[in-house]
A protein has these predicted regions:
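Short, structured segments at the rim of ligand-binding sites
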Residues: 1-194
Length: 194
């Protein structure tokens, strides 16, 4: 899920191999609701380069809601990635974190980067997408946890300029050698000692 979000945010083409597609549950369908196109090739997922992606609306035109739920629902660990991806989509979406407290308290960092997000309460945030018309701005930020950390990393990679993320140990706990893996894909990530 994180790499799918990264491909969308950076407008990159990406093939993710050996994803065990049958075990992804509704994750691919939720990305499709954000307008992210992908193709299943056996057990691989191919995400083509996309200049734009449009968030679906409900049939009556009302704003789409993406919410977490116990399996087979959407894993709460990906909500932060969906939130970041929505910042550059065309349209608006309500992200509803039902299962945990305080997981949306990283949105202030995205707002500092130029994202249009309204934090409704500790469980809900409305994202108004930029449709890639306004790039996020680089900034200095601190990773509060694994999920928010990788979402901030995705935001930083799509932003204009150089960002600094502190407390990267949080990201390392969930994503082994993330900088090496992303640099192999063309990213420019450097670890610095402070």
């Amino acid at each position: 899920g994180s790499f799918t979000g990264l491909a969308a945010m950076t407008r990159s083409e990406l093939t993710i191999r050996n994803v065990s597609f049958e075990n992804l549950g509704i994750i691919p369908a939720q990305f499709a609701r954000l307008g992210i196109r992908f193709e299943q090739h056996g057990d691989d997922i191919y995400i083509p380069q996309q200049e734009h992606y449009r968030i679906e609306n409900f049939m009556d035109g009302s704003i789409m809601t993406i919410a977490d739920a116990p399996w087979p629902g959407l894993t709460p660990d990906l909500l932060s990635v969906f939130l970041v991806v929505a910042t550059q989509a065309k349209g608006s979406v309500l992200i509803h974190q039902k299962m945990f407290e305080s997981r949306l308290f990283f949105v202030d960092k995205l707002i500092d980067m130029g994202a249009q997000i309204i934090l409704c309460d500790p469980h809900r945030a409305t994202v108004i997408g930029h449709d890639h018309q306004m790039r996020l701005r680089a900034t200095r930020m601190t990773s509060p946890d694994i999920r928010a950390g990788v979402a901030l990393l995705i935001a930083a990679m799509s932003a204009e300029g150089t960002s600094t993320i502190q407390n990267i140990e949080q990201i390392d706990r969930g994503y082994k050698d993330i900088d090496g893996r992303l640099n192999a894909l063309g990213a420019r990530i450097t670890r610095v000692e402070e």
